[in-house]
Amino acid sequence: MMLPRCFVTVLLMSSVLYIGGETSSEVLGPVVSTEAGSFQGMELTTHGERVIYAFLGIPYAKPPTGLLRFKKPQPADFIQGTYKATEKPPSCFQLDSDLQLPWADPDSPMKEDCLFLNLWTPASLSTEEEELKSVMVWIHGGGYTSGSSALDVYDGQTLSSSGDVVVVTMNYRLDAFGFLNSLTEDAPGNMALYDQLLALQWVHTNIKYFGGDPNKVTLFGESVGAFATSFLALSPLTKGLFQKIMLESGSAYNKLTVNSIDQAKNNNQLATLVGCANETFTLISNPEEVVACMREVAPAKFTQTYYKELGSEREKINFIFWPHFGDDILPTRTAELIKEKNLTALFAGVNSVEGSALSVFFFPEVYQMFVESNLTLTKAYATILMNEFFKVFNFQDSAKAIEFYLGDVEDDDEEGIRSALFGVVGDYIITCPTIYLADKYSERGANVQFYRFDRRPSTSQWPPEWMGAAHNDEIQFVFGMPVRYPEKYTEEERTLSEYMTRTWTNFVKSEDLKLKNGSQWPSYSLSEPQFATLQTNEQIIGSGQRKAECDFWRPYFDI
């Protein structure tokens, strides 16, 4: 499957909101001795004068450089002396695209030596078993080509202090560094997932020294971070590393996976562009030599130069830097993996207009046309765009899908036409795969609760009101940005953020979720697929979210 490079930036912007500044005071904190070494963190006085400790930039793997580039990660060496864990780590090398907005740029330097994690913990730091805190481990989104645990929006201090939990965020390798596949151990693909696995193993071994309970770990993520979270939940290699998951806008039923052979064939194009392969000397025919050559290529050449060599944005393709099935971490496809797992608790949800931001990056010129030139979106043009979208995914029943979404929309109903376009993109990529996994968890007897985020942030980077609550808009509320930066938000948004951080951390601690009025959050089941809205006005309980749309798509997914 060949994806336009502009589409990669869709999920790229996922989870990379940056709002600068800090509100907490910082002083050196205690030294914590672990099985990985001794680490000195910072003491933070957060909102409400709560004190927590932050340990930033802890290495969990050896630098994936030199001979270790493109290989599975190796555990970091034991640290001699005391490691000063007071600065967020560098970001992993990632895409430099003209489509990224300024606020989507990483707020730290990019380095290949980037496999670090950060953690925030309540100041008690008790290691007594009965006093250990529940743990939340976050996997950021970004299309597997962008993102960083150093971004301010992922600062875990508010979650930790408000919810009395330990919060962990991690970097993992991106783009070619995380997914190059030569069909050999020199570059086996899925390195990013193995990075995440190693970080979870580090947490399991060491989190008790920071006051966290290794037996009460919840893994959560957004967009491809949610994809990865649910993949890891189904992997045979993660047994005992975490107990439940939370998914924000995404699941393992997504269409953005590949088989190894196709991945290697497409990765050969990258090897050719950086001067390490040609028509007769390929990544598949000569993997050892080609990968050895690629280890000598400057990191920036992978993430910048070769994309620019491909010409226009429309011509840029995704070299299929996505997870693949068929190795130890993902032995087979999601539908088979899920049969083998004992599924426990799931809290999941989507945003009300997932497809708006995704459509903008899939067709960036369209957004500019409608916003800057005030043009009208017609059914004819929407049909062209939908057909282009379906070509990317090699979807054969495009006429049937277009009729389903546009057939009953009047020619002069621009709002309805726009809603249909956003629906196609959002339903296919995010909303329906998330619902399908919730269905499967419920079918297997797991405790499932579902939300729909409905608030368009006052800090939104999207001028048109019709963008709505777009992909990734909920993250700033989950991590408490309105609490940390009240001057940038309304009082209603601050209240919503406080409620959401409480909801997320309550799920982690007890799964006892409450609605705003104090009543019980509804359970999600196949017979009653109930959800609760997250918005600044009255909370609504709904059922069968996007039911007709997801029933339409269901036969096209391997569930």
Curated annotation (Swiss-Prot):
Binding-site list for substrate: 142-143
Tissue expr: Expressed by the venom gland.
Swiss-Prot/TrEMBL GO biological process terms: acetylcholine catabolic process; choline metabolic process
Sites carrying sugar chains: 278, 342, 374
Pfam family, one: COesterase
Alphabetically ordered keywords of this record: Disulfide bond, Glycoprotein, Hydrolase, Neurotransmitter degradation, Phosphoprotein, Secreted, Serine esterase, Signal
Gene3D superfamilies: alpha/beta hydrolase
Main enzyme class: hydrolase
Enzymatic reactions: acetylcholine + H2O = choline + acetate + H(+)
GO CC, one annotated term: extracellular space
Cell compartment(s), UniProt: Secreted
Active site residues according to the UniProt entry: 223, 354, 471
Cystine crosslinks: 92-114, 276-293, 432-550
One MF annotation (Gene Ontology) recorded for this entry: acetylcholinesterase activity
Range of residues in the leader sequence: 1-21
EC id: 3.1.1.7
Modified residues (Phosphoserine): 223
Domain of life: Eukaryota
Principal location class: secreted
Job of this protein: Terminates signal transduction at the neuromuscular junction by rapid hydrolysis of the acetylcholine released into the synaptic cleft.
Family: Belongs to the type-B carboxylesterase/lipase family.
Name of the molecule in the record: Acetylcholinesterase-1
Organism: Trittame loki (Brush-footed trapdoor spider)
